């Protein structure tokens, strides 16, 4: 997996092991959204959604694919410094693609159930782990508002402990960077590009309103798959 590939001079020198890992890396493509750009209004404006998807997410995809191509070339030439440099680009842009692909699924228009409280086993798990849905939302909003710079706030599940967790990650680091057993259920993008056109510098208002279009049905499906 691109985000876990560690490049070293020793790996490059031996060659075979890293080349086998490299074969598992694939180029990415921009996924279609399951709704129109304006379908999440007024919580998230159509202008933001279009810019976020077509420009920002597309840039992560383009830069990842470019870095992957350059990595293949550097490996073939035995260029260890370039390989090490490209690892950072692959991690950042690959994380950007993975995180945003989850983010789009985490949202749904109100007419399609966006904002409806979680049902089933996830609803029970939230009450057990946090006391109530309101307490969970309050904690995630506080974590997201307090995050310095750019990053993400996540609701995840530890698939071994069967326990819900709230985590933040910096920049485009995915949730798995906080633990190999963590699976994302919901991720909220708190980069300024996710809200600034509409909410200016008032991130708490964005965090408050995004719950009105949260796709808890999707989150519950992931939870039940990981914790049957």
UniProtKB/Swiss-Prot annotation:
Tell me the compartments it is located in: Mitochondrion matrix
Q: Which residues form a coiled coil?
A: none
Entry protein name: Superoxide dismutase [Mn], mitochondrial
Catalyzes what? 2 superoxide + 2 H(+) = H2O2 + O2
On the tree of life, the source organism's domain of life is Eukaryota
Q: Which Pfam family, giving just one, matches this sequence?
A: Sod_Fe_N
**Needed cofactors:** Mn(2+)
- The organism is Nicotiana plumbaginifolia (Leadwort-leaved tobacco)
Q: Which GO terms describe its cellular component?
A: mitochondrial matrix
Subunit-structure text: Homotetramer.
Q: Does the keyword Manganese apply?
A: yes
Here the transit peptide covers 1-24
The record's family statement is: Belongs to the iron/manganese superoxide dismutase family.
Keyword Mitochondrion on entry:
yes
Q: Taxonomy-wise, where does this protein's organism fall, top ranks first?
A: Eukaryota, Viridiplantae, Streptophyta, Embryophyta, Tracheophyta
* PROSITE patterns recorded: SOD_MN
Q: What does this protein do?
A: Destroys superoxide anion radicals which are normally produced within the cells and which are toxic to biological systems.
The EC number(s) this enzyme carries? 1.15.1.1
What is the gene name?
Answer: SODA
């Amino acid at each position: 997996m691109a985000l876990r590939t560690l490049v070293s001079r020793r790996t490059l020198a031996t060659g075979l092991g890293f080349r086998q890992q490299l074969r598992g890396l694939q180029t990415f493509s921009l996924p279609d959204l399951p709704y129109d750009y304006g379908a999440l209004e007024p919580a998230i404006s159509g202008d933001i959604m279009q810019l976020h998807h077509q420009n920002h997410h597309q840039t992560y995809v383009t830069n990842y694919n470019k870095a992957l191509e350059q990595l293949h070339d550097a490996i073939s030439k035995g260029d260890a410094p370039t390989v090490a440099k490209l690892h950072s680009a692959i991690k950042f842009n690959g994380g950007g693609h993975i995180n945003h692909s989850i983010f789009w699924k985490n949202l749904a228009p109100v007419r399609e159930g966006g904002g409806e409280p979680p049902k089933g086993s996830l609803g029970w798990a939230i009450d057990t782990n946090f006391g109530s849905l309101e307490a969970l939302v309050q904690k995630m909003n506080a974590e997201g508002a307090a995050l310095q710079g750019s990053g993400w706030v996540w609701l995840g599940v530890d698939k071994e402990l069967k326990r819900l967790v709230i985590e933040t990650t910096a920049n485009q680091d995915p949730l798995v960077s906080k633990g190999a057993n963590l699976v994302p259920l919901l991720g909220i993008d708190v980069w300024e590009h996710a809200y600034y056109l509409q909410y200016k510098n008032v991130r708490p208002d964005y965090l408050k309103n995004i719950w009105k279009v949260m796709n808890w049905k999707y989150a519950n499906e992931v939870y039940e798959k990981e914790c049957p």
